[in-house]
Amino acid sequence: MKKRARDLSIPFEGICGKNNAITDVAGVEVGYTTIIKGEATADTNDDSDFARTGVTAILPRGKQKSAVFAGRHDLNGNGELTGTHWIDDSGFLHGPIMITNTHSVGIVREATSKWMVKNRF
């Protein structure tokens, strides 16, 4: 099992939740999926049927449709953060937080938008 910061004696203020997980916060819901397809070899090329990817969805207030306060920080300017202009302008986040690899940002944004419309989020 991967060690957590507290296991390495890195100090944090406060007390851990029961599971030391984001889902210890009341109302937070998390879902994820991972796609592992094919085998990588030295001969794997662009035409191969090979994938290692995934996405994590975090609903800060579960299925409640109210916004949460939000802020952001760019560590090094790499990667994509869809929706940052709204966070900068309003200080709020309305909807799920989606975590994926840079190459999947577009399709994840599209799927999230469709999910939000379908669920009237």
Show where each model-derived region lies.
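Alpha/propeptide regions of enzymes that mature by internal proteolysis
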Residues: 1-121
